[in-house]
């Protein structure tokens, strides 16, 4: 699940890309309490306050729906941190293009992390085709001009290596991937 903020960013890519997402326009999100915690809030002690604010937004949404306001109008109350399901279909060329742009250190951390995870998966499917997907700084030089971050990612770093360097808080704990059993789900 991704945040609605990620959805707003990634859907800027329109050529040879298709998206299917849950919709605030048609679906009733009353009772939803599932939010992405921004990376820079992790470990700050501010997580509970952030989640409280997100929850408050969704309670306002729910009250509007109960009062007869349509889902679309009530959706303006929804937090950008609300988790959202998103399916993306793209040509290999577009995946490479999106990854090059979106794993750049100038992007939001959630966008970078999600695109690095997608890059990991694409490499596992076809390493030859997707091994050179890194940001422009890894493949010759930054194209941001005076807007450069000044922190080039070394060539030959894998997406897994970049995650370890740039997202250490997410590497500190074991995160169960879909399909893996935890102690509560084994017989």
Task: Identify the residue ranges that each predicted region occupies.
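Family-specific signature for flavin-dependent thymidylate synthase
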Residues: 1-187
